[in-house]
Amino acid sequence: MQIHVYDHAQQVGQAAATLLAAQLISKPNSVLGLATGSTPIPTYHALISLYKAGVVDFSSASSFNLDEYVGLPAGHPCSYHSFMREQLFDHVNMPADHIHIPDGNAADPQTECARYDQAITAAGGIDMQVLGIGRNGHIGFNEPDDHFTCGCHVVNLTESTIQANRRFFDSEASVPRQAVSLGVGSILASRCILLLATGEDKAQAIHDTICGDITSRTPASILKTHPNVILLLDRAAAGML
């Protein structure tokens, strides 16, 4: 693991955007793995600035998002489809048919999981995967559990994750209880992984990921088995190292 610590979240975002831009410049048809949540927003805004400056071009690239809530249609304002359009895709030139996000409203979520894994394989795999990390150490929606799940799967969200996502919804009752998520095997198949963490509320998870044992109770700890992982942290998230 490479570990880089920055003064604040905006610098983390700029550093991640610089690495993603370098990937796109070296391989214009790169397959990017993208994440949602508040942590990668500065990264996406920095990428938009690089695109507007003519530094980076998305026209040949494609993307696969990590996850989507079960039961939310793509047009729902709290769906990850909506999030990605607002934070990135509406502002750059990635073709719509190159953008892939799980269908959380699919009639059969299990079939959707198999389809999504097959689509990633058909695209040649993910070149650079962006990850955030949950307070409980989850990556994607791979929650602490008694085992690691390899492929795309349906996840029952933990109470801590439901509470963390409560702020995005009108009420706690409206927060989805399940999600479709890439599994750790799908994530580890990426050729390069960028793990972003900002804020002191992520410090314990980062400590456990880096300093603790590899365990499914801290899902991000499995990243220590990958040969090309770059951690981009602000000082608050690195505070327990």
Positions of the model-derived regions?
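Class I SAM-dependent methyltransferase SAM-binding "motif I" and its flanking Rossmann-like core
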Residues: 140-184
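A glycine- and small-aliphatic-rich helix-loop capping segment at beta-alpha/alpha-beta transitions
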Residues: 46-57, 80-82, 144-153, 212-214
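ATP/nucleoside-binding phosphotransfer catalytic cores, i.e., glycine-rich phosphate-binding loops
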Residues: 185, 189-241
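Glycine-rich beta-strand-to-loop/alpha-helix junction loops that act as flexible
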Residues: 34-39, 131-135, 198
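N-terminal glycine-/serine-/threonine-rich phosphate-binding loop
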Residues: 1-32, 237
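Glycine-rich phosphate-binding loop
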Residues: 124-149
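Ligand-binding beta-strand-loop-alpha-helix segment within the catalytic cores
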Residues: 56-128
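Glycine-rich N-terminal segment of FAD-binding domains in flavoprotein oxidoreductases
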Residues: 26-52
